[in-house]
Regions:
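Glycine-rich phosphate-binding loops at beta-strand->alpha-helix junctions
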Residues: 14-25, 121-148, 156, 160
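A short acidic (Asp/Glu
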Residues: 24-31, 55-57, 78-83, 139-146
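Acidic, glycine/GT-rich loop-and beta-edge segments that sit at the periphery of enzyme/chaperone cores
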Residues: 170-189
Length: 189
């Protein structure tokens, strides 16, 4: 950043993602972007659900050919969300449906049992092509039964903590440079 003569001109778009967008937050961020010199059409805001959408649709189509699930960990708490597509509409309407949330036991064996049960209840008998696990609180060491349940039916399972930031980058790229998702419309809250 220090060696760039005109930082604002060299950035094609600035994307900010946050768990939830509120009107005061949006107004404050827009003012901050304006103060930094960014025109309104190059400063973007989205919540984590929209970042999940962009991250998912920028993957190979086989990753999202069926349902896509998301488990969000926050220490002992875990919540579930699902990417839903109405493939019969044009453009294809895509949204995120929030599911249940639960608190997991702190002891490893019981934690695995709790999460495995939550996975079964959340996924029900639907067909998923992929599942994402994000946040702090998931560890492969305790999740023996859970991982086996998640990986059933040839589901692809991914875990890490960069899904929302990568989704924000893909969204900025889509809005400023590419138009890969022309046939899709994100429908948020």
């Amino acid at each position: 950043i220090l060696g760039v003569p005109d930082l604002v001109k060299s950035i094609s778009g600035l994307m900010i993602t946050t768990p939830v967008l509120t009107r005061p937050m949006v107004e404050n961020i827009r003012v901050a972007c304006q103060e930094m010199g960014f025109p309104r059409n190059r400063c973007f805001l989205q919540d984590y659900e929209e970042s999940f959408y962009y991250h998912t649709l920028y993957q190979k189509p086989e990753i999202w050919s069926r349902n896509v699930g998301l488990f969000i960990f926050d220490q002992d708490a875990v919540s579930y969300a699902k990417l839903e597509m109405n493939r019969s509409s044009r453009p294809v309407r895509v949204g995120v449906r929030r599911g249940e949330h639960t608190t997991l036991h702190t002891e490893a064996l019981q934690r695995d049992v709790d999460f495995c049960q939550f996975v079964m209840e959340s996924l029900e008998n639907e067909v998923y092509s992929s599942i994402y696990l994000v946040g702090d609180g998931f560890e492969r060491e305790w999740a023996e039964k859970s991982v086996a349940e998640l990986c059933k039916h040839q589901r692809r399972v991914f875990y890490g903590n960069n899904l929302f930031s990568k989704g924000a980058c893909y969204a900025a790229k889509e809005k400023t440079e590419e138009r890969n998702l022309k046939g899709y419309l994100y429908v948020g809250n």
